[in-house]
Amino acid sequence: MIKEIISQYQNKSFLVAYSGGLDSTVLLYKLLEIKKKYYIKIRAIHINHNLTLLSKKWSEHCKKICNINHIPLIVENINIKNKTNNLEEKLRIKRYNIIYNHLFSDEILLTGHHINDQCETFFLSLKRGSGPTGLSSMSFETLFGTKKIVRPFLKKTKIELQTWAKKKKLHWIEDFSNLNIDYDRNFIRNEVIPILEKRWSYFLKNCFRTTIICQQETRLLNDFLRERIYKLIKFDDSLNIENFKNIKQAMCTALIRYWLLLKKIKMPSYKNIQCIYRQMIFSRIDSNPKIILGKHEVRRYKQSLHFIKTQPSLKNTLLFWHKNNIKLTLPNNLGYLIKNNNGTVLPGPKENELINIRFQYEGYVLILGRSKKRKIKKIWQEKNIPPWLRNQIPLLFYNNYFISAIGVFVVNIKNKNRTKCIISWQNDLKSTTNNFFSFY
């Protein structure tokens, strides 16, 4: 399998995730054998999780093996203070972030995952109630940001790797924390799978076959959905759900899942997807429901679903802008306001007026070009500003006089004895959601 990988990839530069255990040790030595016949570049990376007093000793073992074999080794340390909630997931995320930062653009990350690991992952997904995508578990090749992870041993059992390692008289680390069945993966590995294998000797390979079938069916489903989803995605990346009430629920939820898949986030649970379907499709047309997904939200506005990053409320924020300052930085990464010649023409402040920026206003407003005051909520609606953006737009005040929602509208005030000033709002918000803004 490794020879096939060497011939398949032109760059032939590999970074081995080297724990010092059986799997990664076999992987490292397999590559060394191939290096005798083919030109390849090998580096290794060892992550010390600092979970045991032996951690330092394991790092030294990895250094020794790599020094003997002239393999450049990177050693990094992880220290997690809170070792209670979801420790395995926290370590995995930190580990892969570190590895990604060390991975060269022309390198492929190789890991020693085998059939046993695949079966464990399958059972963990089963425990979570996953569908075909989750039950697909690991694939031979996975996109890793802009790079790749390849798992050459995914068809091999742990016994096969162990047999080869003993034959070659290799030395590897035995991590006895793997026997601690308080961790779900260890429980499956040590308590569940041995019983199943004892009953059915072919269980592991059939479990692996199931993951391959799930992968194939997931690819087919995604191909099917891809053709339909791009007809529903608008230019602002929102999802048009206007006709979802006339489509079967299974198709609707599949389209929602695929749309979220394109956002490159951790896939929401079945429960969350069903919640999005019920609340977004069947709530009142004038309501604006939201579902929170970690640091993001799914919101509905005018028969479209929007995926947005949750922003802290600016309701009580008040910023003072000194008249001598050309630029004012805004909170929440909203960019900055600047006095220049490319923005909105506004009435200037009087000598005794303080310039201040707020993000909340309630009441009636008379905007330029109109003859009657209207509730500001109605103006936001008219300008197609969705609710979650309304308290992110800088509102310009002179003392307590409302002057402008920068870049959206200007308030009609008496201009007597006022000079003119030009202010522009430089930010990513308008460029990514420019369909919501009408500029004067």
From Swiss-Prot:
EC number: 6.3.4.19
UniProt main location, coarse: cytoplasm
Keyword match Transport: no
Family of the protein in this entry: Belongs to the tRNA(Ile)-lysidine synthase family.
Organism: Buchnera aphidicola subsp. Acyrthosiphon pisum (strain APS) (Acyrthosiphon pisum symbiotic bacterium)
Binding site for ATP: S19, G20, G21, L22, D23, S24
Protein name per its UniProtKB record: tRNA(Ile)-lysidine synthase
Annotated compartments: Cytoplasm
